[in-house]
Amino acid sequence: MSIDKNLLKKFTLLYVEDDDVIRVELSQLLSNFFSMVHVAKNGKEGLRTFLENQDEIDLILTDLNMPELNGIEMIKKIRTIDNKIPIIFATAHSDSEFLAEAIKLRVQEYIVKPIDVRYLLSLFNDIVSNLYQEFLLKQQREELEKYKEIINSNNIVIKTDTHLNITYVNELFCEISGFNSEELIGKELKYLKYQDMASDIYTNLYVNILNN
């Protein structure tokens, strides 16, 4: 598959590897693709680096067998802080015990050494594509909430479906009508006609909804 370098450049990677040669070579290569690559030489340093930069680190690539703190133990500690950050394990092992432990830690992928760089980049590409979609959805939800706040603070708002069943009312409408949203959502618009709402207000609402 093609690698979206522009997309990868929006993200920051934590790379943990105890082999000096592999760490230097791969980190230099990955720096061409990511916005930033934080590098650590063992699990203890990797954990410290994550704690110091957790607000900007988007995903983790880590070796399994390392001195001081191995990859499994490091990720266990990271998972107590962030249970969603995507993780890829690089390992020379593919035994069932490791896989079971990785599943418990919600590891997205694992890659067997020696690392196939193109395959690794394709894994990264899939992960950041999902992260970016989640970001866009979150951004849309936040913008919608801001829009609702603006609308709610300045206008009386009532929405209906094509059958004139009430689907949404804002706080200002509730204050004026004397109902709460739970009492109104799902009711037919004409429900208001038989309550205490003034007939001229109901008529204006009805006409405006039909015209819009």
Question: In which residue ranges do the predicted regions lie?
Answer:
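Receiver (REC) domain active-site loop signature in two-component systems and cognate sites
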Residues: 66
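Conserved hydrophobic beta-strand signature of PAS-family and PAS-like sensory domains
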Residues: 157, 164-167
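Two-component/phosphorelay signaling modules centered on CheY-like receiver
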Residues: 6, 11, 19-39
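PAS-family sensory/regulatory domains
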Residues: 185-197
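PAS/PAS-like sensory domain cap-loop motif
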Residues: 173-184
